[in-house]
UniProtKB/Swiss-Prot annotation:
Its main location: cytoplasm. The gene is nudG. One of its GO terms (cellular component) is cytoplasmic microtubule. GO terms for molecular function: dynein intermediate chain binding; plus-end-directed microtubule motor activity. Belongs to the dynein light chain family. It is found in: Cytoplasm, Cytoskeleton; Nucleus, Nuclear pore complex. Homodimer. Cytoplasmic dynein consists of two catalytic heavy chains (HCs) and a number of non-catalytic subunits which present intermediate chains (ICs), light intermediate chains (LICs) and light chains (LCs). Component of the nuclear pore complex (NPC). The nuclear pore complex constitutes the exclusive means of nucleocytoplasmic transport. It comes from Emericella nidulans (strain FGSC A4 / ATCC 38163 / CBS 112.46 / NRRL 194 / M139) (Aspergillus nidulans). PROSITE patterns: DYNEIN_LIGHT_1. GO terms for biological process: conidium formation; establishment of mitotic spindle localization; mRNA transport; nuclear migration along microtubule; nuclear pore complex assembly; protein transport; sexual sporulation resulting in formation of a cellular spore. Keywords: Cytoplasm, Cytoskeleton, Dynein, Microtubule, Motor protein, mRNA transport, Nuclear pore complex, Nucleus, Protein transport, Translocation, Transport. It comes from the Eukaryota. The lineage of its organism: Eukaryota, Fungi, Dikarya, Ascomycota, Pezizomycotina. PANTHER family: DYNEIN LIGHT CHAIN. It holds the Pfam family Dynein_light. This is Dynein light chain, cytoplasmic.
């Protein structure tokens, strides 16, 4: 059953400045968040708190279907991807 959800949530990386390992971790955390929560704010909060805990502060996360962005981020700490119809922007600042 869990593999069915993961199959539906195939990540599509749109823009990235992040190691392969961290990209994979970001996708895995996002999948966990989307399995636990259905409200975009709650999904973003889960991802942000997980990355703050695992990788150190300060991470920012935006989750949604229709938004524009232009951000400054630490080198090697940025990813923008889709899981299903939901866009996820995750980045770290100093």
């Amino acid at each position: 059953m869990a593999s069915e959800k993961k199959d539906k949530l195939e990540p599509q990386i749109k823009s990235v400045d992040m190691s392969e390992d961290m990209q994979q971790e970001a996708v895995e955390v996002a999948i966990e968040a989307m399995e636990k929560y259905h409200i975009e704010k709650d999904i973003a909060q889960y991802i942000k708190r997980e990355f703050d805990s695992r990788k150190g502060a300060t991470w920012h996360c935006v989750v949604g279907r229709n938004f524009g962005s232009f951000v400054t981020h630490e080198t090697k700490h940025f990813i923008y991807f889709y899981l299903g119809h939901c866009a996820i922007l995750l980045f770290k600042t100093q």
